[in-house]
Amino acid sequence: MKIAIYPGSFDPVTNGHIDIIQRGRHLFDKIIVSILLNPGKKALFSLDERLDMLTESLKDIDGVEVDSFAGLLIDYAERKNAKAILRGMRAVSDFEYEFQMALMNRRLNRDIQTVFLMTGMRWIYTSSSIIKEAATFGGDISGMVPAIVEKKLEEKIGYVVNHKKAED
């Protein structure tokens, strides 16, 4: 079985993340979507909230497991018998960091490959940080996040749309 790990903070999960997962399923038998516990990052949502949002958002996609981990990604991938790390790239600006991480992971374990998928054009500008900022100021984020995320943002920060949606 070809298993890939798709790591991230998913604070919150976006439709761009889901696009990468759906396309990754064409390449792998199983994708483990795993939240990295990073004490250096201040998350808006708790680990449990992020796990719940991911589980709800991915419930209709077969071959996907939701999990979390702390420590080195490559060690986690070994424990899960994964042969690949799946990463999405939005723009050239993502490349340098992702390339360095891929090289380090390859140095630590040559048997685990990093596979990059370019984000679909529809999601190229989307990131969890931008979503949170837009929601904070009442920007319309519908269609950019799963319904459960929109609901949780409303509960967490009082997200209410106060701007008209622009045409795509």
Swiss-Prot record:
Enzyme Commission code: 2.7.7.3
Gene Ontology cellular component terms for the protein in this record: cytoplasm
GO BP terms in the entry: coenzyme A biosynthetic process
Catalysed transformations (reactions): (R)-4'-phosphopantetheine + ATP + H(+) = 3'-dephospho-CoA + diphosphate
Pathway participation: Cofactor biosynthesis; coenzyme A biosynthesis; CoA from (R)-pantothenate: step 4/5
Predominant cellular place of this UniProt entry's protein: cytoplasm
Gene Ontology MF terms in the entry: ATP binding; pantetheine-phosphate adenylyltransferase activity
Residues that bind substrate: S9, K41, L73, R87
Keywords of the record: ATP-binding, Coenzyme A biosynthesis, Cytoplasm, Magnesium, Nucleotide-binding, Nucleotidyltransferase, Transferase
Binding site residues for ATP: S9, F10, H17, G88, M89, R90, E98, W123, I124, Y125, T126, S127, S128, S129
Cofactor(s) for this UniProt protein: Mg(2+)
Annotated compartments: Cytoplasm
Record-marked site positions (Transition state stabilizer): H17
Listed CDD domains: PPAT
Role noted for this protein: Reversibly transfers an adenylyl group from ATP to 4'-phosphopantetheine, yielding dephospho-CoA (dPCoA) and pyrophosphate.
Family: Belongs to the bacterial CoaD family.
Assembly with partners or alone: Homohexamer.
Name of the protein in question: Phosphopantetheine adenylyltransferase
Organism expressing this protein natively: Desulfosudis oleivorans (strain DSM 6200 / JCM 39069 / Hxd3) (Desulfococcus oleovorans)
Taxonomic path: Bacteria, Pseudomonadati, Thermodesulfobacteriota, Desulfobacteria, Desulfobacterales
